[in-house]
Amino acid sequence: MKGTTKTGNKVELEFPINTSPGILFKRLCTPHGLSEWFADDVNLSGNIFTFFWDGDTRKAELVDKKENKCVKFKWLNDNEQESEGMLIFKLQTDELTGETSLTVIEEISDDEDVDETISLWNHQIGELKRLIGA
C-alpha cells in the first residue's frame, strides 16, 4: 500500500499494481472480474450488482464507469432506494515510470471500524495482485 487517507467517514487507500490499466479495469467493473477477488459471487441485473460473501449479500448500483480510469458504485440498502455510501476505484498511470496505481475510496458508516476496513482492503487488494500476477 502506498498511501492512506482517513477523512471523516471516508477511507482512501492507494496501491501500486504492476499491470496495465486494461487488465486491472476488467477486474473492477465486471461480475466475473469482481468475483475473482472481491466477493464469492457477483450477479448483475441492469446496473445493479449483487455481491455475495459467506451468507452476506449487498447490492450496489454502478453509477459511473470510465474505461481504464474509474469505477464508481453506490451501496444500496435492502429496498435498493437509498445510498449507504460509495465505493470508488480509480486507476492512474505514472507518466515517468509507467507504474499503475489503484486508489480505493470507500465511505463507511459511523459504526464501522476504520482500521478493520483498511485491513480488509489490504487483504482484498493482495488477492487481486496475486490473481493478476502483480
PLM features: residue spans?
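Hydrophobic-ligand binding "helix-grip"
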Residues: F52-T97, I105-S109
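A conserved amphipathic terminal alpha-helix motif
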Residues: E107-A134
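A short, polar/proline- and glycine-enriched secondary-structure boundary/capping micro-motif
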Residues: E36, E82-M86, D111-T117
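Short, charged low-complexity linear motifs
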Residues: K10-V11, G22-I23, T100-I108, G133
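Hydrophobic ligand-binding cavity/cleft-lining segments
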Residues: M1-N43
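Hydrophobic pocket/interface hotspot
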Residues: L24-L28, L34, F49, L62, ...
